[in-house]
C-alpha cells in the first residue's frame, strides 16, 4: 500500500539578468556641459538599478556612481581630445533576488579649447596676392578658422571661415 498525499502547487519565478538600453556617446568641448545620461531598461516586473565607473576622472566626472549621470561641465586643459570610457552595470531585483547583467560601455569625448597660433603682421604691395597662414597646437581634429576684417578697403574679405588642420587663406589685396 502506498499512501499519496494531496498535490501542492507552487510558483518558481525566474528573474532576468540586469539589462541596460544602449547609451549614446557624447562629444563636448572643454568648459561646456555634457547632457544628462538617463539609464533605462527593457526589464519589467522588478527594479533595475545602475552602477557606473569612469576611467578618466580628469574630465570632471567622479570615478564611480549609481543611478543616472547628471550633466557636468567637461574639462580638458590639453591640446588633444580626451576620451573617457564610462561602464554601466545593470542589476535587476525582484523577490529579494538580485541578478547582475553585463557591463555596457559608452564614451564621453572632451575636445580641447579651440585656439589659433598668432600670425605675423604683413606689408604687401597693392594688388598682390598673399597667403595668410593659420595654425594651431591642437591635434586630433579639425579646426575652423573664422576672421573679421574691419577695413574692407584692403580687399580682404570682410568675414570668412575655413576648416583645416593647418591652412593658408589666400586673398588678393587692393588699396
Annotate the PLM regions.
Residues 1-3, 91-98:
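Short, solvent-exposed loop/turn segments at the edges of extracellular beta-sandwich modules
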Residues 7-14, 101-111:
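C-terminal edge beta-strand
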Residues 17-24, 113-120:
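Proline-enriched interdomain boundary motifs that mark the N-terminal boundary
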Residues 27-33, 122-128:
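Short, solvent-exposed loop/linker segments at the N-terminal edge
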Residues 33-41, 128-137:
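A short beta-strand segment in extracellular, disulfide-stabilized domains
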Residues 45-54, 139-151:
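Solvent-exposed loop segments of extracellular immunoglobulin-like
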Residues 80-86:
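Exposed beta-strand face motif in extracellular beta-rich ectodomains
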Residues 165-172:
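Conserved small/polar residues in nucleotide/adenosyl-binding loops
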